[in-house]
């Protein structure tokens, strides 16, 4: 399994880091088989697999449950788990307690925290406690209400400068990597060049040290629409729909199951059962 030092080395050698979300055992198993470098168990699972309206409703228990499943499917891949909404804002003591629980119960290798102001102390505290932290700046879904919706961040001078400053502060606080979401590519390059830690982009252009996308977006599974920055490499929904329709038709038509799908016992055994043929 790759470690923090491997990711730093990949940045130094200009080798792209591949990160992909996974929320359960089969998707994690497939991600590891594809040799991705990192798996993110994002709180996006709330919308993608739980059918919630936003990430705000996702709980610590949800994150632990799904991370445990992912860990079983990808034992040899570095796993980053999101700390969910308000689990690291009340106090440093509460933050440490929640983080320790997630790490101990889920098997995650690092935790991801969204935001800049108000989060730097949490990054420092977790780092001092021996918990690797991945920072997340730009479009931060847990704060989408404050940001005014799902919009590109850092397009004007003031907000771009703030992103640069916050990125440097995250690194200084001890973050081992930074996720930049929905940020202009030119700004991503500037930040990537300035930081020693790896920068992983999502909707942040090609100049980051790595890329992350949502598993379901990549394979076209259960998504009605995808953002501009997503490239779909398959349309699993179409295959699933065809398979399920065919299954329904065959059951209704009595063509499934066939004899090859059926187990049998010997006739004399059947005859000897209660209600069998009397001789």
UniProtKB/Swiss-Prot annotation:
One of its GO terms (molecular function) is magnesium ion binding. GO terms for biological process: pantothenate biosynthetic process. GO terms for cellular component: cytoplasm. InterPro entries: Pantoate_hydroxy_MeTrfase (IPR003700), Pyrv/PenolPyrv_kinase-like_dom (IPR015813), Pyrv_kinase-like_dom_sf (IPR040442). It catalyses: 3-methyl-2-oxobutanoate + (6R)-5,10-methylene-5,6,7,8-tetrahydrofolate + H2O = 2-dehydropantoate + (6S)-5,6,7,8-tetrahydrofolate. The gene is panB. It holds the Pfam family Pantoate_transf. Catalyzes the reversible reaction in which hydroxymethyl group from 5,10-methylenetetrahydrofolate is transferred onto alpha-ketoisovalerate to form ketopantoate. It comes from Bacillus pumilus (strain SAFR-032). This is 3-methyl-2-oxobutanoate hydroxymethyltransferase. Homodecamer; pentamer of dimers.
